Amino acid sequence: MSMEEDIAALVIDNASGMCKAGFAGDDAPRAVFPSIVGRPRHQGIMVGMGQKDSYVGDEAQSKRGILTLRYPIEHGIVTNWDDMEKIWHHTFYNELRVAPEEHPVLLTEAPLNPKSNREKMTQIMFETFNAPAFYVSIQAVLSLYASGRTTGIVLDSGDGVTHTVPIYEGYSLPHAILRLDMAGRDLTDYLMRILAERGHSFTTTAEREIVRDIKEKLCYTGLDFEQEMQTAAQSSALEKSYELPDGQVITVGNERFRAPEALFQPSFLGLESAGIHETTYNSIMKCDVDIRKDLYSNIVMSGGTTMYPGIADRMQKEITALAPSSMKIKIVAPPERKYSVWIGGSILASLSTFQQMWISKQEYDESGPSIVHRKCF
């Protein structure tokens, strides 16, 4: 089907922590908001206050004191469809201010997303929102496109889940995809714990957001953990101060690199899994021996949890230690990697060669939700 020039496709990246949405062809998403739905904890007392039965995104975040907050996407997979529908409704009508029945919609999905989930997404887009056309794409594959490659291994780490996804000539290799249930949310929790050791107690969901901000502004990945610990113990060179919303100033020291270190040493969180470096290596080793060289030289980082300063150098060091000694290793960490899934979607949906890939409303009406497995891979 040919798309009219002026009708831009909508690109929506639904991640565990933040939803990114905008128009195909743009270089950044127009809307980025938390993937949260909040419902009032108590019945409204004041009559006529127009209290809504649910709030989404930033509004839910700002009213969090009176709401129960729920994330409908857990570990990258949608687990609550009613709440998910609210997030999509909010995306179309409040954030982008578009009529979904007028635009093709590209959604993203986690690697290894269950088949029933893809069908449900397809059904909701066509039946609830009456989209004229639809497509669903794997997040890591889009990140790779955004880096200008079609072959490589993507380490995608967001708020809810981390995946290593080997991709060859544009196709992900499902047998070699590995999932780590450790990501930004866990690092925030860990930072809350180690700040408590210093006497700074953060407990509520509202205070957790403060800790997330500390994490994003002050944390970094050390090249050599033991070395950093020594430096921190001997001097105050690594200390930084942070002002809390009430004006109190706290000092953050070795917590700055101890929290992100858990990515390489999950035992810090009480997890028995391999770190991100080892998981990446294991993923490569599950691939055919002939393509490993191409993967080692194209290790692409994506997602907010790969944004720590120093993480690429550390990754280079760790992979070099695991790989064969003659292997050329290249870590690619684009500055815009927080949004590279969305950017890849924007690129894909605006390619002229992609226009025949859309699932049209007509095809959906003829075949039903299972059409998604034939057209999107």
UniProtKB/Swiss-Prot annotation:
SUPFAM superfamilies: Actin-like ATPase domain (SSF53067)
Record keywords, A-Z: ATP-binding, Cytoplasm, Cytoskeleton, Hydrolase, Nucleotide-binding
Enzyme Commission code(s) on record: 3.6.4.-
Top EC class, one word: hydrolase
GO MF annotation list: ATP binding; hydrolase activity
InterPro entries cross-referenced by the UniProt entry: Actin (IPR004000), Actin/actin-like_CS (IPR020902), Actin_CS (IPR004001), ATPase_NBD (IPR043129)
GO cellular component: cytoplasm; cytoskeleton
Phosphoprotein is among the record's keywords: no
Classification via SMART domains: ACTIN
Catalytic activity: ATP + H2O = ADP + phosphate + H(+)
Compartments reported by the entry: Cytoplasm, Cytoskeleton
Main subcellular localisation: cytoplasm
Domain of life: Eukaryota
Chain's role: Actins are highly conserved proteins that are involved in various types of cell motility and are ubiquitously expressed in all eukaryotic cells.
Similarity remark: Belongs to the actin family.
Protein name in UniProt: Actin-2
Gene that produces this protein: ACT2
